Amino acid sequence: MSSGGLLLLLGLLTLWEGLTPVSSKDRPDFCELPDDRGPCRGIFHAFYYNPDQRQCLEFIYGGCYGNANNFKTIDECKRTCAA
């Protein structure tokens, strides 16, 4: 293969890498945890990452305990688990 062809291939692979979503091995382990309301009875809109749907979803957080897959904003969830 010519050097021009190799450069083109390298460029395409680099572009592909930038377009592919983060694999599960690159995201924190807590992103795999289920949504967890916790035992308290508050009503707080929060977001968690759903690994089956590969997106951040809203849920109601009770205000205490729960787990680390719990974000105040969808943007924070996406930056941490889906980006």
Curated annotation (Swiss-Prot):
It is found in: Secreted. Expressed by the venom gland. GO terms for molecular function: serine-type endopeptidase inhibitor activity. Pfam families: Kunitz_BPTI (PF00014). InterPro entries: Kunitz_BPTI, Kunitz_BPTI_sf, Prtase_inh_Kunz-CS, TFPI/VKTCI-like. SUPFAM superfamilies: BPTI-like. It comes from Pseudechis porphyriacus. Belongs to the venom Kunitz-type family. Disulfide bonds join C31-C81, C40-C64, C56-C77. Keywords: Disulfide bond, Protease inhibitor, Secreted, Serine protease inhibitor, Signal. Residues 1-24 form the signal peptide. This is Kunitz-type serine protease inhibitor blackelin-2. Residues 31-81 form the BPTI/Kunitz inhibitor domain. The record marks R41, G42 as: Reactive bond for trypsin. The keyword Hydrolase does not apply. The keyword ATP-binding does not apply. GO terms for cellular component: extracellular space. Serine protease inhibitor.
